[in-house]
Amino acid sequence: MFVNIHRNGAMGVPPKCTRQIVHHHTKMGKIMADLFEKKIIFDLECYPSLFVLSALSLETGEMQSFTSPRDAYEYVRANGDALFIGYNSNAYDDHIINFILGVNGECTASDVREISDALINDGIPVRINRFRSYDVYDPIEAGMRSLKMFCGSYGHTTYDSPYSFKDEREYTPAEVKEIVGYCEQDVYYTRDVFNNEFGYYEAACARVPVLQEYGISFDDPRRVVCCRSAALARNVFSAMCTNGRSPKDDARTTIKFAIDYTTREGIGDAYAFYRNIVEKGDELSSKEEFYNKETPTVRLLDGLDVALGWGGAHGAIEGYVKPDDVKILYADVSSMYPTLMIKHDFYPYTFTPHARGLYEFLYHSRLTYKKQGEKLKSQAAKRLIASLTGMLKDKFAVFRSEWSNNSITINGQLSVTDLAYQLSKHFRIVQVNTDGVMAEVKSGEEETFRRIVDEWCVLYKYEVSSHEVKELVQLNVNNYYMVDEEGVTVKGASFSLNRDYFNDKAVCKKALPLSVVRKCDPLEIMKDINDIRDYLILIKTTDTFPYLYDTLSGECTESRCIRCIAAKPNGQLAKLAGVRFVNYVKMRSSKDKSNTQKVSDFPTCAVELPDDLSTYDTDALLALLDKDFYAQKVRTLAQPFQEKKEDARCLFALDLSSVQTSPKPLPYPTDAHTTAFVFDRVRR
């Protein structure tokens, strides 16, 4: 293993870095302990008779492409000290490169294709990495595995190769050049994702000094950057934990309860539900039976139902808007699961004292780093802790202890429901989530709220941050818009503003909570929103309907993601803006125009926009824009709130500038053939 544990040695000193890292087209700020001088963005394509590797040096900006495994082998070997950066490469590209390195490049495109088919059809084998790689997709967890869809959301017009991956024929030089162009396009897209999500890379670098401070060193610290958080946590903790599964690891002996819940009013039935499962459970119990049992619901004194489940406790007033005559206080538990593990001794039996020591070090360090403003270190420690807790159910982890994990989650549910019930004796509960409770508190009742929370904290040994929620628009527990002392928080698809690249009709997500809070028509809100990017509508194809057909021009485009805006049917304004009207439908085949599917929620009149809007007259586009189309969408979405909270009024007007949704325009390669290829290519 590459982990060296020095239990009594001197603590490692985090290396300092004052160097400026400059990426191709993008200047990044200082980063912590960047362990790689050379970074290369790469992508590859595997056809039955053609292999392509394209690689872009971030330091020099040079793009190189190779069409034989041998040439690719020589390039990777010559850059053995570099970090190779791919998109979703952990699942595919890394395995291909490792195969080529393993046979010293002595293979054909057909041999590589066999490995590719095995990866796709038979799953991912255990990989021994022969080079250093970093997957930009892995930490993002965007739920969008397609790179082209991802960058289509950025605003790029994206294309797929017109050549089938099942086509076994030889390609002409012109066709090879075209396929290489597609591969290079994906490299530039990966570059953009890496630059925009650079904080994840910085956090990966921060793992090294965090673990060094505990006395853990590494034979090759650069491998730490390449590891997923889960893999690193598994590696580090496995070296400290006992091996094998104990016969005592069952529900009866492992699931513990933090307090005597029989003394707590209101949650007796929920406790009895779990207690009954535990008393009947053992190692031979069917896990399916254990998890498929219908979990209980607790009704609070104010009538709100809190549903308990293996993922946490949840309850919320649906269609809620904060009134102006009360304040909402939010009791938010800090690091609930680690706190239960440490302060109630819910450690798995596999943890040695040294493993416990590291876990507690990460727990306390994360809080210390956060207070000191060291966000990268705090985030690195947080991810290691979260990964470790989740891996207690991982059948491949040496330290796995499934029932220990259940012990943590069950007590988390019971304890937060207990707090909600105690608060419901005095206050109206607005929301209950996995690690916190929101309640309406009238003026003069704040001390009662804090007293109940403080007593609860002493009982469960929690630390809670209680703060005021200034504004709340809540569709349900999974969809809400909140403004508090930390800024704007959004959750769920209805209000999602937290990922800049998911900006499809972002104006609707901005205007919905603001129009409800201010009790005004969405058009009034939209008068002040004049960034054309907030009005973009993304049209994404599917595997079933992979083509987009414009019924007005009769053209079929290969683009996997097109962006448009709703427009007024005014040809003169369109001409002044330099755009044309489009009406897209999806097609199964580019040759069969009868087999189409309507694009959901597509405006009657629309214009298509490219990724670079800098050459367009913004005033002309705004004059053409049909804001009423978007306002009508918001009116429909706002109906549940207006029906349930017609008397809601706003305490203050929200500052629109506090919500940032539109990404900055991204630079694109200036290489002539690539630029022309990306912007001008419309086939068939």
Label each region the model flagged.
Residues 4-6, 23-25:
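Intrinsic-disorder-associated, low-complexity terminal segments enriched in Asp/Asn/His/Tyr and depleted
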Residues 27-119, 289-290, 294-301, 305, ...:
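Conserved RNase H-like, two-metal-ion catalytic cores of nucleic-acid enzymes
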Residues 29-34, 45, 153-161, 167-338, ...:
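Conserved "right-hand" nucleotidyltransferase catalytic core of DNA-directed polymerases
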Residues 84-89, 94, 105-187, 385:
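Active-site-proximal helix-loop-helix substrate-binding element of RNase H-like nuclease domains
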Residues 137, 141-147, 162-170, 174, ...:
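Helical catalytic core of nucleic-acid polymerases
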Residues 261, 294, 303-310, 378, ...:
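C-terminal, non-catalytic extensions of nucleic-acid polymerases
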